[in-house]
Amino acid sequence: MKYLILSLVANLLVFGVLSAIGLNINILAAMMIVLVIPIMISGILFFKTNIDKTYIFFNIIFIDFYYYIYNVHLMTLPKFNNYIKAEMMELEDIDVLITSKDFGFDEILFYTLYLLLILIVLYYLKKQVKHKI
């Protein structure tokens, strides 16, 4: 249980720091941090916990919640639309679609599936490691 709480608090800190940084970070760097750091924290601590399915469930729920709050926070910032326009000009050579419309269900669904798939793979890896020992 302590690793679950540690994971939730560490991920809250990651999203808290990102929220504090706000729009003062490159959008690709922010996207990479959002996609990589929370799953790294959860993955590393997953191998230390004994409550596998509960750990996966609560990590997905809370990380999705943190992600949602982070995005809603960014969209309420007064400079958000100008930030998106500037970033799109900077990324004109890369085919990335960034919209300034409301944050929606498809983003949460993608992030949930992303987390779920990685944690399921880690779950089966952990089971294989336990059986070999």
Swiss-Prot record:
Q: Which residues cross the membrane?
A: 3-23, 27-47, 55-75, 103-123
Q: Which residues form a coiled coil?
A: none
Chief localisation class: membrane
Signal peptide from the UniProt entry: none
One GO cellular-component annotation of the UniProt record comes to: plasma membrane
Q: Which domain of life is it from?
A: Bacteria
The membrane topology noted for this protein in its Swiss-Prot or TrEMBL record is: Multi-pass membrane protein
- Subcellular location, record wording: Cell membrane
Q: What does this protein do?
A: Accessory element involved in the expression of sarA and several virulence factors. Modulates SarA production and/or function in a strain-dependent manner. Affects the transcription of the accessory gene regulator (agr) and genes encoding virulence factors including alpha toxin (hla) and protein A (spa).
NCBIfam families (alphabetical): membran_MsaC
Please report the name of this protein according to its UniProt entry.
Protein msa
Q: What organism is the protein native to?
A: Staphylococcus aureus (strain NCTC 8325 / PS 47)
Starting at the broadest rank, the lineage of the source organism is: Bacteria, Bacillati, Bacillota, Bacilli, Bacillales
